[in-house]
Amino acid sequence: RLVGTTSNVIPFRTYKFQDRAFLEMDEVLGQHDIGVEKSRDLGATWMFLTLFFHHWMFHDFSSFGIMSRTADLVDKPGKKDTLMWKLDFLLNGDGGRGGLPAWMKPAKTYRSMMLMENRDNGSTFEGASTTEDAFRGGRKKAIAIDEYAAFPTGDDYKALAATQHATDCRVFVSTPKGASGAYYDVMHTPSNIRKIILNWTEHPDRGVGLYTSKEGVLEILDKEYKFPEGYKFVLDGKVRAPYYDQ
């Protein structure tokens, strides 16, 4: 949120770590799998959707799949935190805010449940939840699987199998959750997957005042930050900051 405004619609002005991630994803999009390991609330979902949307707009016959652990997280009428709603917002905005200017929009589009078509250039978005038959109907330039580590046990491997032959490029996006499951396997099994790390320590506001500890001994990483007198450091060996300690 921008300082001095209460609006929920703000410009997506990217930070340097987001710029780097955009370029890395775009470099290999459509070629091989991408694994995104992210901290919470760093815009990762908006990032891959925006990248897909750019290709949907400007690259002919670009077909994309988007998946989450339930159908309602992908598309549900009236629900504004679904993946498809975010794509609707990128195109048309909401309540007069956001969206593309009229001159930039495709002349012909089509929208139905779990589907969004650019009929000017033949590009499509198709949504799906975790079923064994997801995206069996045709090849995709890329398929994004959002919050993959949060998929129910079993569904995560079904999604992996269902998407294996549907695209050369699956984008596995998640905050890590334990040392088991399909997301963990994908990120830790040797392969040609392009791994992209989005860590809260790179955020210019949240990464202020970084510190850590070794065997209970404090180590200040951000030498320029002045901690308040009497600050209660947490000496658990993790990289921390006042943001993290809240």
Question: Would you name each region that the model predicts?
Answer:
Residues 1-246:
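Phosphate/NTP-binding elements of NTP-utilizing enzymes
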